[in-house]
Amino acid sequence: MSVTIQGNTSTVISNNSAPEGTSEIAKITRQIQVLTEKLGKISSEEGMTTQQKKEMAALVQKQIESLWAQLEQLLRQQAEKKNEDATVQPDKKEEKKDDTNTAGTIDIYV
């Protein structure tokens, strides 16, 4: 009996600025890579029964799934933060425009 594991093991994260959590994302990505390599080597391990190999593979797969969930959450948080920052900046610009329109104007009542 053989255990075949298929999956996407490469993750590309590119961002010109280094947002918060980038090091955490890199750490999680590296853990996923290490576990994926480990998963591929389980079937060739000697000294383990087929059942033990299946259990080990299932455990490693669960760890990978958990790390993917953490990675997705971090990426979602970064996207939300980026969106919040983008919506705050236009408001500030509008306030400045309003200030310049009223600056230097004198109201005279007769």
From Swiss-Prot:
Gene this protein is translated from: flxA
A Pfam family this chain is assigned to: FlxA
Record's protein name: Protein FlxA
Organism: Escherichia coli (strain K12)
Annotated Basic and acidic residues bias: 78-100
Biased composition regions of type Polar residues, renumbered to the chain: 1-20
Region: Disordered, residue numbers: 1-23, 78-110
